Amino acid sequence: MLDTIRSWVNETNLHFATSRRPCTEFKELFAGYFPESFLARSYYVEVPEVPLPPLEYVSQAGLDDLFGQSVAGLTLDDTYYLTPSAANNLRIHFHELVHVAQWQQLGYRNFISRYLEEISIYGYDQMPLERMAYDLDARFVAGGPVVDVRQTVRKLLEDNDTDVSLRSHEEIE
């Protein structure tokens, strides 16, 4: 199934390749959080509807509940997809860039495997990969101390802690 998902991710990113915009347009806003070199290799696409995997993949992976709801954004490797209303929300861009960093740190197979496992165990709202992204985007919005997101993601993933909440990882600051 991972190979099937990988094919869909690659095909989707290829289909939208000419519409991708580099995230370097956020370099001033996200200075200190993401290096410009990372932003230059991260992309987003504004789409009327976020591309979703074929229904048979969704059902097979047990993600009916996740993709049954309205999806404002979805990260596929180095590219994330946003609806027009989400594209104007800086916090959502930040959140999706955390997922790009997670993809890079874990690699394709480990990211997908972990995401599927976490969502089946914890559900979307409590799964560690999403909590990590939500905690980091909340810190950004609150104007808290700037942290290097890639290093923070790396540290949290290396800890391999099921509770990746930044509140329990104050040593990262």
Q: Model-predicted segments: where are they?
A:
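N-terminal targeting leaders of exported, membrane, and organelle-targeted proteins
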Residues: 1-11, 99
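Conserved N-terminal glycine/acidic-rich loop preference
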Residues: 8-9, 51-53
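Short, surface-exposed loop/helix-turn segments at secondary-structure junctions
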Residues: 54-64
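Short alpha-helix carrying the canonical HExxH Zn2+-binding catalytic motif
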Residues: 85-102
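Glycine-rich, acidic and aromatic/proline-enriched surface loops and short helix-turn segments
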Residues: 103-107
